[in-house]
Amino acid sequence: MSSKSQQPPTGLSKSAAKKRAKKAAKQSQNPQPQSAPQTSSQTPASVPPLPPASVPDPLDPAFFNFPGPGSYPIDVQYDDTAYYDQVDVPLNQGDFPGSYSIDYNLSLQNGSQLAGLSAPFNITHDDLISAANELYKRMADPEFGSDDAYWSSLPPHIRQFIRDAVPFTGSISQSTPGTTSSQRTMYQMAQQIVQAASQGMGLGHGMSANLMPGINANARSFPSPQQTIGEEFGFHRHPDTREEEYDDEEEIEEDQGHPAANGDAPKKKNKKKKKKGANAASLSAPVEPPAPLPPLPPPSTLSKIPRAPAPVPQPQLPTHQPQPLSQQPPSLNPLPPPAPASAPTPTPPSSRAAGKQPMGTNPPANPPARSARAAGKAPASAAPPHNAHAGHSHNHPSTAKPAPKGKSPATAPPAKIWTQSSAEDRENIRVFWLGLSEAERRDLLRIEKDAVLKKMKEQHRHSCGCAVCGRKKVNIEMELDQLYEQYYDELRSYAAEQRVAANGLRPPPSGAGPFPGSVEVDASGTVTQYDHRAPELHDHDPDDLDGEESEEYDDDDDYADDDELDDDDIGTDEADVGDEIDEPPPPPPITHRQQPRRPPVKAPPRSEGGDDFLSFGSNLATIKGILTIADDMLKNDGTKFLEMMEQLAIRRSVREEQNLRDMQEETDEEEEEEDDDESRDEPMTEKERAEEGKRMFQIFAARMFEQRVLQAYRERVAKQREEQLLRELEEEEDSKRAKEEKKAKEAQKKKDKKKAQKQKAEEERLAREAALEEEKRQAKLRKEEAERERMRRQDEERVRREAVKRAAQEEAQRQALERKRRQQEEKEREEEAAKKKREREEKAKKEREARENELKEKERKEREIKAAKEKAEKERIAKETLEKAERDRLAKEAKEKAEKIRQERLEASRMEKVRKEEAARKEREAVEQAKIIAAQQAQRERAAKAEKNTADKAAAERISAARVIPVAATAPVLATLGLKSPSKGSTPQSAPPVPQLSPVKGAARPITNATPGRSMQKTPTAYYPQPVPPVGVASFSRMPLAQSFGPPGLRPAYPTGSPAYSPPRANGSSISPNPPSRGFTDPSPPGFDHNLRTAPIGVGFPPVKPSGRIPSMADDAFSPTAPIGVPVTRSVSSAGEMGSLISGSVTPDDYRPTPPAPIAPPNLGPIGRPSFSDGQTSGPNVLRSTSPPPPDRVLGSAALGADDEIVQPQQRRPTTSWDMPTAAPGSGRWSASPSIWGSGDPTPAPSWGAPGSMPTVAERPGPPPGLSLSPGAGVNVLGQRQPSFGGIGSSFGGVGAVGSVIGGGMGGTAGSGLVQGHVGGGGYSQGLFSPQHQQQQQLQLQLQLQQQQQQQ
């Protein structure tokens, strides 16, 4: 945790926090035997006790300080006393369960073995080193772990690694001996992290084989206080660590007399205390190690760092009990072998002394080689100094490239110099360099500097991006630029010296050449010639060296300044760079003899950054390390070069800070003495160190520049050789081209000669050909002249023929036009005739319509008068007795009879007119058809006479039978004609019918089963048939009933079988002649409109309305196909309509009025008869009445109240059978062959009822009572010829038949009939072919009426 980036959490200043930490460390150094169990009598007395149990939890985030990913770990605020304190580590009694996984993709449990670590890692070797050092430093400070913000500031991958690497959180409890479980856990965690770091962080097999090998043994052995666990595994504390120089005097006095745990004397300033070697020896005496430990050997030489050999398994320490190898695989980096027992090894120096003092112990003969990752990342331990200068010792930074994360280091051969420059190459480079101009030299150096900067920037791309690192990058670039400028000046001066030496005026400059800083190295990696700045090498006397060392190292207080670090230095990233780039020194140069080292003594003090490249002197290993850096740069590996440049850039700021501290110390009273000591102890001045730094960079730059210039030289040589080759090729090409040109000239001469000969022969041939061509031309001209003459004659002949042909075409066109004109005139004449015909027809139609309108107006007025009278008659009927009712009935019958006579007369006159018009239109008909029509007319006249006689008899019978009926029933003729019956007792009316007359209720209602709210109406009807649907039959809707009407003795002016009475079929098809039949017609053929508004001219049938709306009088009166005679409304289309007709509930708009008929005596319906209400009708065409049903069994005129609302039921959908009145009323006997409507559909249809079969009341409901499907009775199919009129009354014998309609038919006499679902009195109904048959039917009807009256 950097002191600049993070302030103390308690709000204290840096110095106050430092004081607190030092006081806590002094308190912990006081011996407290009872706080820690003693496991051995050899435990030093100076070991401080374990901290109390209140130490924070081992996973407290404040205990860990891991840097983020990058090349430069975050600086740690070191505490000397806390770092070098050694405590007793309680060990677990069981097997060590810790095996560590760095694979963050796995969730490992405590004690699980690792199968392999192949996942990518985000933790570098530097992270683990910093974490271990931080843990060791903080273990003695119980208050240091209270900074919770620190744990949250750690990167996620560091926190995850700590959780994975410390599986002891739940396994250590308070039951463990001692009260320092947290401290013990922290020690174990630190040791595990160190072990993981030493094993390369990527090795899963055998990772825990050598981790704390004596952890399961009862007899525990610990390193000596001078060598901590971190130092045992190759770690040492920061070499430049120093205490604060501005601590107050009182604090320093309190620190006196307390020896440090590592055997060093208390670190005080020189001006406060001057102690010599005796005091230091006495203080270090009680901290002898409990057992001798072999010293860690130094790593391999720098030249072998990048390519470490395969690791050799080594035995473990003799004082520990290793675990069986069968249980755990061997470690790839085991501990070094123990030293021989007969030759005890002196105690190695501490990490501080290892970084500053010469090593007192010789390295083992066979040191184990580290992996490339460990050798490149781990700090050097106990580095032996070089003997180049007396009293000067230093360590070299490690320049090995770290191995890739997550991968095991591969076995590689020993490293050697990447490329060697022979003497010939050096001479060629020198000559080439001297031959370049000034601009070319500067360009070469600029290119080299740009390449180095580019590589350095690429290396920086993957490093940290914070502001501190950014400033560091800028400083490095500035330092590099300045160094290259200085090197260019050196190059220029060195080249000048070489040119002077080449002229023989001066000896050649020193150094290997050809550039300043060049070093010559042979193929084996040995430096054969140094650079031009290399100092003179000489041997030192061993005695003098020892004496100097003894004298220098006696004064321990001279180096007390190194124990206190300035906070400003600690808070910067530069303070740790020395550790980061330290490299272990190789064996001394071949020109020196390795001297035996004395026991560890203090080295002379060094300023910050002293243990770096700047103080290498003539060390051979350092020179080869620089060469290795250059070779790595040439291989695009700039890691080591980046470290070197960082130290060079840091050096400047370190010097500035040192100068600042020197200025602050000027006020001290012993400053002069201290300066004298430091000047005496400092082996090199700042200027010398700067010069050494320049020399170091010049060696690097020369190595790089040699390759650059050699490459340029080789390029130039290659270019020259290429140009020479091109020149030779060009010369060869020129010679070949000359030869080819000579040959071409000779060949051309030969060709020209041959060409001249050929030309002469060609001229002769052309002359001959020209003569022949002239002859051919003359012949062609003669032939063309003859051809032109022939063509002229042909053209003349063609013109003549074309003139003849054109004349013929003109004649044909004239004839065609004449023919077309005649056709057009004929067509015009026809159109004129047709137009006149249409005009005549239109005029007749208009006259007919005028007459019909006049007649309708008269009828409307008559209906109004009749309605008024009926209303008054109803009121009288309620009061009068049965006798008055009988009297009224007789009067009504007389009136109806007179009205029928008048109506027949009117109809006869109308029929005459219609027949005349039909005769005019049928002028072109065949004579045979006229004969047939005449025969049919004669036959119908005979039938009419018989019918009149029968009607007279039936009328008399009805009058006698009606006398016993108390209430008269209205004539059912109105049900088919749509007219309101006049009131009972009213006199015959001769006024014309009045349309839209309000309904007039009948004189009396049936006693039972009467349809509520309906009234019966009797009106005079025309003598032509009217459509009557069967009562109560829904499936036979819209089927007209053919009847003939007319009083006895009256005959129509024209026979009913004349063509004028031929009713139209669908789409205008006429009724074709058919054999006599009384059946109804079948439904219209497919594709025909069921609602065609067609009706025969002169037959008062209205056009058929669409089923979706209620017809109106205006539609019927002004329809283009409306009948000329008395208009008749549309037929009833369903059983619901039939029921409403029978019940008397009809509206003026539904049924067109006709002149009133004589009043017939009322008939009462049978008791118990089912009414014809809407609810009792069945079939698809049932129409529900919306009129409110009045109470049943209402008798008399009360059932026909004037206030009853009459609602015309609507048809819901078109019917599927018998939907259209394809036959006009009375068409059962009509002959239609000579009709103007054309031929119709000859398909027979089922008829209702057989002749003579009269079903009784309450027969089965299949067909309606009295209706059968056997052919021979009822209305015949449209288009079939009928010889005579037949009565339809014969086909209605039971319930559902409309007897009153029959009674008011062609016979002319008003018959009394029952309207409640059964047939009333007969009247003049039509017989099948004879009056006897019709008489039988009338008798049956009368018998049925009598039975019904008796039941009532």
UniProtKB/Swiss-Prot annotation:
It is found in: Cytoplasm. Residues 16-25, 268-277 have a biased composition (Basic residues). Residues 26-45, 317-330, 368-388 have a biased composition (Low complexity). Signal peptide: none annotated. GO terms for cellular component: cytoplasm. Residues 1-12, 218-229, 1008-1020, 1173-1186, 1208-1219 have a biased composition (Polar residues). Residues 531-541, 653-664, 681-693, 726-749, 759-880 have a biased composition (Basic and acidic residues). The keyword Coiled coil applies. Residues 242-254, 542-583, 665-680 have a biased composition (Acidic residues). Pfam families: NST1. Keywords: Coiled coil, Cytoplasm, Stress response. InterPro entries: NST1. Residues 1-66, 216-422, 503-522, 531-616, 651-693, 726-880, 978-1118, 1139-1275, 1307-1336 are annotated as: Disordered. Residues 46-59, 287-300, 331-349, 1153-1164 have a biased composition (Pro residues). Its main location: cytoplasm. Residues 712-943 form a coiled coil. Belongs to the NST1 family. May act as a negative regulator of salt tolerance. This is Stress response protein NST1. It comes from Cryptococcus neoformans var. neoformans serotype D (strain JEC21 / ATCC MYA-565).
